[in-house]
């Protein structure tokens, strides 16, 4: 799940180092590269947390963040990486529990039709699978009932980790009977999910053989790849007293 959040808030307790950085352009480039790597390996790429969880000081696992950004700000910062990823052919999108576009009402984006249907699928023309973030998170579950129904009505296709499943299913069935949600809408979502499953070969691929899995993964090639990735990922922010590069002749221990 490539994280497309632009982390411009140093007090962010939940995104922080999960983000590729504070530059929307850099984040977009890294998300696209990550997504393409996953897709090339036969893995569905799902970017998150739409429409952007980078400038918050609240963890939506525990509470609902309060955001009141202008649309111009959203377009230039938060939405930029997501827009670029969509243009590059991203397959999946996870919507976060953030009250964007409807901050005064406190409606999480994951349950907002303005965000999921109007902004993501209509305006930004995203045609892939739309996931909610985990529905057991306090940012969405604390003061809400019939969360799954609201998510489906908003335009989400897949609902992650719902609570009170029996009650949620009953609420959806009642909504279909009352005309608040149609069978056709549910069928469309199911077809989307099955289409991606077939495209990924999940109807044919056997289960992973667990015996000897560690040896098949931990090869000389993968160890070398991990080493090179680590080398390329390190960035020097300051070099006090010219400690770097390390000199094995004068020092024995280095703490990074």
What are the language-model segments listed below?
Residues 1:
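Catalytic domains of carbohydrate-active enzymes, especially glycoside hydrolases
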Residues 4-14:
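Short, conserved phosphate-binding/catalytic loop or strand-edge motifs used
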Residues 12-13, 112, 219:
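Serine-centered coil/turn micro-motif
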